[in-house]
Amino acid sequence: MIIGIGSDLIDIRRVEKSIERFGERFTHRCFTEVERARSDRRANRAASYAKRFAAKEACSKALGTGIAQGVFWKDMGVVNLPSGKPTMQLTGTAAVLLEAILPAGHRAAIHLTITDDYPLAQAFVIIEALPESP
Protein backbone atom coordinates (compact mmCIF):
# COMPACT_ATOMS: atom_id res chain seq x y z
CA MET A 1 0.00 0.00 0.00
CA ILE A 2 1.16 3.56 -0.69
CA ILE A 3 1.83 5.49 2.52
CA GLY A 4 3.48 8.60 1.09
CA ILE A 5 3.82 10.57 -2.14
CA GLY A 6 5.98 13.62 -2.76
CA SER A 7 7.16 15.66 -5.71
CA ASP A 8 9.43 18.63 -6.26
CA LEU A 9 10.46 20.86 -9.14
CA ILE A 10 13.60 23.01 -8.85
CA ASP A 11 15.35 25.56 -11.05
CA ILE A 12 18.86 24.25 -11.77
CA ARG A 13 20.11 27.85 -11.99
CA ARG A 14 19.29 28.27 -8.29
CA VAL A 15 21.58 25.35 -7.45
CA GLU A 16 24.27 26.72 -9.79
CA LYS A 17 24.19 30.01 -7.88
CA SER A 18 24.39 28.22 -4.52
CA ILE A 19 27.42 26.22 -5.70
CA GLU A 20 29.09 29.38 -7.06
CA ARG A 21 28.39 31.37 -3.91
CA PHE A 22 28.98 28.77 -1.18
CA GLY A 23 30.94 25.98 -2.90
CA GLU A 24 31.74 23.02 -0.66
CA ARG A 25 29.93 24.63 2.26
CA PHE A 26 26.67 24.12 0.33
CA THR A 27 27.43 20.66 -1.03
CA HIS A 28 28.75 19.33 2.30
CA ARG A 29 25.76 20.73 4.21
CA CYS A 30 23.08 19.26 1.93
CA PHE A 31 24.51 16.14 0.30
CA THR A 32 25.92 12.82 1.45
CA GLU A 33 29.42 11.70 0.53
CA VAL A 34 27.96 9.26 -2.02
CA GLU A 35 25.89 12.02 -3.64
CA ARG A 36 28.87 14.39 -3.80
CA ALA A 37 31.11 11.74 -5.35
CA ARG A 38 28.53 10.94 -8.02
CA SER A 39 27.59 14.56 -8.79
CA ASP A 40 31.17 15.86 -8.88
CA ARG A 41 31.97 13.34 -11.66
CA ARG A 42 29.17 14.62 -13.89
CA ALA A 43 29.71 17.00 -16.80
CA ASN A 44 26.64 18.94 -15.70
CA ARG A 45 27.40 19.03 -12.00
CA ALA A 46 24.68 21.54 -11.05
CA ALA A 47 21.93 19.50 -12.75
CA SER A 48 23.06 16.38 -10.89
CA TYR A 49 22.98 18.21 -7.56
CA ALA A 50 19.61 19.79 -8.43
CA LYS A 51 18.03 16.39 -9.09
CA ARG A 52 19.27 15.12 -5.76
CA PHE A 53 18.04 18.26 -3.98
CA ALA A 54 14.60 17.80 -5.57
CA ALA A 55 14.63 14.13 -4.49
CA LYS A 56 15.26 15.15 -0.87
CA GLU A 57 12.41 17.68 -0.98
CA ALA A 58 10.08 15.10 -2.55
CA CYS A 59 11.08 12.48 0.02
CA SER A 60 10.49 14.85 2.93
CA LYS A 61 7.02 15.59 1.54
CA ALA A 62 6.31 11.85 1.19
CA LEU A 63 7.28 11.46 4.86
CA GLY A 64 4.68 14.09 5.64
CA THR A 65 7.04 16.59 7.26
CA GLY A 66 8.89 18.58 4.66
CA ILE A 67 12.30 19.71 5.86
CA ALA A 68 11.19 20.13 9.47
CA GLN A 69 10.70 18.20 12.69
CA GLY A 70 14.42 17.43 12.93
CA VAL A 71 14.80 16.08 9.39
CA PHE A 72 18.09 17.25 7.91
CA TRP A 73 19.22 17.29 4.29
CA LYS A 74 21.85 14.62 4.85
CA ASP A 75 19.30 12.32 6.55
CA MET A 76 18.09 11.53 3.02
CA GLY A 77 20.42 10.44 0.25
CA VAL A 78 19.96 9.30 -3.32
CA VAL A 79 21.59 5.92 -3.88
CA ASN A 80 21.41 3.41 -6.70
CA LEU A 81 20.32 -0.21 -6.47
CA PRO A 82 22.56 -2.79 -8.17
CA SER A 83 20.26 -2.50 -11.21
CA GLY A 84 21.09 1.22 -11.41
CA LYS A 85 17.60 2.28 -10.34
CA PRO A 86 17.68 5.25 -7.97
CA THR A 87 16.13 5.10 -4.51
CA MET A 88 16.46 6.95 -1.21
CA GLN A 89 18.51 5.85 1.78
CA LEU A 90 17.22 7.34 5.03
CA THR A 91 19.17 7.83 8.25
CA GLY A 92 18.69 9.79 11.45
CA THR A 93 15.33 11.43 12.06
CA ALA A 94 14.13 10.66 8.52
CA ALA A 95 14.55 6.92 9.19
CA VAL A 96 12.73 7.27 12.53
CA LEU A 97 9.82 9.06 10.85
CA LEU A 98 9.65 6.40 8.14
CA GLU A 99 9.41 3.66 10.77
CA ALA A 100 6.66 5.63 12.53
CA ILE A 101 4.43 5.72 9.44
CA LEU A 102 4.98 2.05 8.53
CA PRO A 103 2.15 -0.28 9.52
CA ALA A 104 3.17 -3.17 11.79
CA GLY A 105 4.50 -6.16 9.88
CA HIS A 106 5.54 -4.10 6.85
CA ARG A 107 8.79 -2.87 5.36
CA ALA A 108 9.29 0.24 3.25
CA ALA A 109 10.11 0.43 -0.45
CA ILE A 110 10.99 3.93 -1.63
CA HIS A 111 10.42 4.48 -5.33
CA LEU A 112 12.20 7.47 -6.88
CA THR A 113 12.32 8.98 -10.31
CA ILE A 114 14.49 11.99 -11.12
CA THR A 115 14.92 13.93 -14.34
CA ASP A 116 16.19 17.22 -15.65
CA ASP A 117 15.61 19.39 -18.69
CA TYR A 118 17.51 22.64 -18.25
CA PRO A 119 16.63 24.85 -16.47
CA LEU A 120 14.44 22.47 -14.43
CA ALA A 121 15.02 19.31 -12.40
CA GLN A 122 12.20 17.19 -11.02
CA ALA A 123 11.74 14.31 -8.60
CA PHE A 124 8.85 12.07 -7.55
CA VAL A 125 8.93 9.80 -4.50
CA ILE A 126 6.44 7.09 -3.57
CA ILE A 127 6.83 5.31 -0.24
CA GLU A 128 5.22 1.89 -0.30
CA ALA A 129 4.56 -0.40 2.66
CA LEU A 130 5.15 -4.03 1.70
CA PRO A 131 4.21 -7.00 3.91
CA GLU A 132 7.25 -8.61 5.48
CA SER A 133 7.96 -12.18 4.42
CA PRO A 134 6.98 -14.81 7.00
UniProtKB/Swiss-Prot annotation:
Kindly list the GO CC terms recorded for this protein: cytoplasm
Report which reactions are catalysed by this protein. Answer: apo-[ACP] + CoA = holo-[ACP] + adenosine 3',5'-bisphosphate + H(+)
Q: Which domain of life is it from?
A: Bacteria
> Coiled coil where?
none
Binding sites annotated in the UniProt record for Mg(2+): D8, E57
Subcellular localization, per the record? Answer: Cytoplasm
Q: What are the recorded GO MF terms, alphabetically?
A: holo-[acyl-carrier-protein] synthase activity; magnesium ion binding
Question: Into which EC class is this enzyme placed?
Answer: transferase
Note the SS bond partners. none
Q: Which Pfam families match?
A: ACPS
Its main localization is cytoplasm
Name the InterPro entries on file: 4-PPantetheinyl_Trfase_dom, 4-PPantetheinyl_Trfase_dom_sf, ACPS, Ppantetheine-prot_Trfase_dom
Segments crossing the lipid bilayer: none
User: In its keyword annotation, does this UniProt entry include Cytoplasm?
Assistant: yes
EC numbers on record = 2.7.8.7
Q: Say yes or no: keyword Cytoplasm present.
A: yes
Q: Which cofactor does it need?
A: Mg(2+)
Q: Which UniProt keywords apply?
A: Cytoplasm, Fatty acid biosynthesis, Fatty acid metabolism, Lipid biosynthesis, Lipid metabolism, Magnesium, Metal-binding, Transferase
**What's a single GO BP term from this record?**
fatty acid biosynthetic process
Q: What's this protein's family per the entry?
A: Belongs to the P-Pant transferase superfamily. AcpS family.
Q: What function is annotated for this protein?
A: Transfers the 4'-phosphopantetheine moiety from coenzyme A to a Ser of acyl-carrier-protein.
Record protein name field: Holo-[acyl-carrier-protein] synthase
- What phylogenetic lineage does the species belong to? Bacteria, Pseudomonadati, Pseudomonadota, Alphaproteobacteria, Hyphomicrobiales
Gene this chain is encoded by: acpS
